[in-house]
Amino acid sequence: WNVGDDGFDTDQSWSGTLDNFVIINPAGHIFELDGPEGTYANGHTIKNGDVYVGIGQDLINVDANSIVDLMDIYFTDITGLNQINRVTAVGVTFNNIVLNVDSVSAYVNGTVPSGITAGQTPKANTSPLSWTWAKIAGLF
């Protein structure tokens, strides 16, 4: 919450899994998912999350060589300035990415992949996050 930079930033072939999360009002990109550097090329998975965009910039920012599976992520509080910057990166998959907008075409740079749709169904299980200050402050 209010990280002042990217909501979640991966670099240098991070190979983990981010599962069940909430990102609130980052100042930079929501997801800054850089590709591998050098010869080590591993991918990662990001799944089951809710994103409250607010002043965030790109919803999802990937490089041409990023390797990431994105699944079951809900974006809300989107403005006309937000977009998914690249949907043609070979190593990036989109599965059940839901934008709380009327039509996703204005928020995707290029042809909208089948895994990105408009809707209003959150994806994160927020009950394990009830202890956080963001939850106590009523931000989700």
Map each language-model feature to its residues.
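Extracellular beta-rich repeat passengers
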Residues: 1-140
